[in-house]
């Protein structure tokens, strides 16, 4: 193997392992590491979009911080040599990516498998020697680097999505570099990336990931630059910038300064100074998010000279590639660096303006993706709220993240408080072809849940009601206007006995499940729950319960599902395997059942609570617990103690309620309230 330590004498390094390896990306001579100087725009197959374009920029004489690429062949070798490839592909088989919770679960499991698998020694040597060679070139020990994913399909002209895989900043030392390269490999299976590949019919087994390891630029100011208007294709340069590292702009954490530049003359045509409240900087080897000093928040970031230098560099890059480019830049000590460049794949034309007649303007922002759309406002403040976005809704949030892409696909338009026209929300909206308004400042506060609004992605305006007239309005109505169910003050819930009936029950439009019975789930196993416990099969019982409860919780999510703990009459469980010792009772309906029985057999109740905890950890926090046939607050108190032993804190982690089925319980309801309950079901 040619050693990376010889790199100064041989500027182009090719690594070749002697052991057998089939390189799916398919070069005659497999490159496992390539420094930027040896890469060009045609090397997307081995270096991914980022890596190939950094090589192309370097060869074109554009100032780029030095670095190297751990190629897609190395990832392929890692997955093959460790035996992970067939395991991961099997986990992805038959996955429904529109099932958000299942997608998140599978993604987390795959990433955990990859990051916990030791990197083979030959690959470790390759990466560590390459990092040491980079440090030698720069003339420093343990150089700080940025480690960025570079998927082989991420930045191709026909497919572009922001932020599918991970980026790690301020990584230092060979061991940490090795660890974060592996994390980048794992990020190929982020939920958002899996979803994107499925939606675009990319074969998971044929998508690879390269990893860029690049000297870290400790930027004083940074941002993005489009060499044409990203929405309309207008031939002028757009620059966005903010203080510190570029993460603040790219992530949409701030509303950056916006500068429009004449491409021919380099003259600044217009600019808007954004309110830049936060910044990312490097402190003690860590990327730190901090507040921008008050005197800089509303101060212009770029000088005329810096704008001219960036515009000139943008023209050079576009001329070199022969097509409009989306670039990232940074300025350190007065020097301008390009961090990456990729083709703009979302160019469109401004849509025909529709006349707006006497409509109230609710909020104003920046038009980030052209078009007009009307729909009902759905405000997203937490990631677990995404499932409330239905087809045709208007998604309103502070700023979108890559995890929101499946919900964004269902929306007819996007509105954000923060961000500029090159933030995540803007890029994804243009890719999806839906209108987007960003940087409104207060949309999440001004707009109301379920309010009907219209957004103008050309002008950056949001109007009250529907403003789409004529044919456009009719066409929009087919996808946006939904016949709302009758609204009542009292919620109407359904009973569900069999998980298989959940879909039909959910389709009724009920406000939730007021009673999810456990007994049918137990009976279908054919085994008495006590037998599971006695034979040490508690985990099997937990998983069986969780699988059945999940079918209901998923259909109704985020509507509440009240799970009633086991209320097993003795006569029904006699026929189960292990039920031979069930006592004989003259009237089982008034006998040993409900919470009385479960406190006598606490292991079964604990297994039920463990199943619910497992589902809560997967995001199904809509499941509440309901205790049946309570007679006294002491029973409720003991049930809560068992729940806490199982890892569920009543009232904090999970809603905890009771069924009132006897006059005695009804007469002392205030005692139950004092003990603490979140809801009551009255059983006549």
Curated annotation (Swiss-Prot):
This is Probable phosphoenolpyruvate synthase. The keyword Oxidoreductase does not apply. Its EC number is 2.7.9.2. Belongs to the PEP-utilizing enzyme family. The reaction takes place in three steps, mediated by a phosphocarrier histidine residue located on the surface of the central domain. The two first partial reactions are catalyzed at an active site located on the N-terminal domain, and the third partial reaction is catalyzed at an active site located on the C-terminal domain. For catalytic turnover, the central domain swivels from the concave surface of the N-terminal domain to that of the C-terminal domain. It holds the Pfam family PEP-utilizers. Its cofactor is Mg(2+). It comes from Methanothermobacter thermautotrophicus (strain ATCC 29096 / DSM 1053 / JCM 10044 / NBRC 100330 / Delta H).
